[in-house]
């Protein structure tokens, strides 16, 4: 039960952070392209890869902290379902190039962010 509460609390924090990040991006860039979700998913991929790499490299990283951060906070922060819906919305608006760009930017950006975080954490760990 304690682990479930850790995930739920982390999820609440991550969801709040996603809302604030997306709201900021909407104010900063406008509604013409889903920059907020792209920012959330790419930065979330970076953070999740960093968390997982650090937790697997160090015995001092408590499993409950990994659960709270990875499944909870990052699970609440990132949003695959919004990414899919927004891609579909762009397609339905006839914005094929924007949909393709969003799809590629998300998939490649998230992968690049995960690789960068993994390499950074390994480098910092020595």
UniProtKB/Swiss-Prot annotation:
It catalyses: fluoride(in) = fluoride(out). Na(+) binds at residues 75, 78. Na(+) is not transported, but it plays an essential structural role and its presence is essential for fluoride channel function. It is a multi-pass membrane protein. It holds the Pfam family CRCB. Keywords: Cell inner membrane, Cell membrane, Ion channel, Ion transport, Membrane, Metal-binding, Sodium, Transmembrane, Transmembrane helix, Transport. GO terms for cellular component: plasma membrane. The keyword Acyltransferase does not apply. The chain crosses the membrane at residues 4-24, 36-56, 67-85, 101-121. It is found in: Cell inner membrane. The keyword Plastid does not apply. PANTHER family: FLUORIDE EXPORT PROTEIN 1-RELATED. Fluoride-specific ion channel. Important for reducing fluoride concentration in the cell, thus reducing its toxicity. HAMAP family: FluC. This is Fluoride-specific ion channel FluC. It comes from Anaeromyxobacter dehalogenans (strain 2CP-C).
